[in-house]
């Protein structure tokens, strides 16, 4: 009941007019859900004689997926804090030239910092998708659909986090930072799309959907 209450409270806050939590936290949560689903497939595989040949590897996947999930949960909070820093910077006084200059420096620094959580979400979820693709191949076949769900959620998390990065990029004045961020976003999105497609091909084959 306590867990249900916390989830309900988060969803209530997400759906409210409050600025946080927002898309950044939701993206990280989607990634955490993907990691949890992939872990479930692994948990249902370990200890089964049919999959004894991959048992040790599956146990490693469980540990890594759990670490990824925990990291993504932390990034939910990090994203909220980063947004609050941006908001605070925009509220700084701008009555004089000195104040405006100081405010601009603070805003640019906060925007740069605000890109870090969603970029970390993208990196962590791409790693999660790599693990998901593997468990889809070697895990219990009857829960392959759950691995597919994890892959779909994971790609959605990456694409959503990309928007949160780009929302800050368009306000940055540092051209090198803009260039680097755009390159990272494009790379992560391409990687996520490739992993999702490969995982889904495996899932469809194991579910007998290609017949």
Regions found by a protein language model. Give the residues of each.
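Conserved phosphate/anionic-ligand binding catalytic regions in large, soluble enzymes, centered on
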Residues: 16-39, 142-161
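A structural-propensity feature for long, helix-poor, extended segments
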Residues: 49-89, 188, 195
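Amphipathic alpha-helical interface segments
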Residues: 79, 83-152, 156, 168
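Preference for long, well-ordered alpha-helical segments
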Residues: 124, 128-131, 135, 142-205, ...
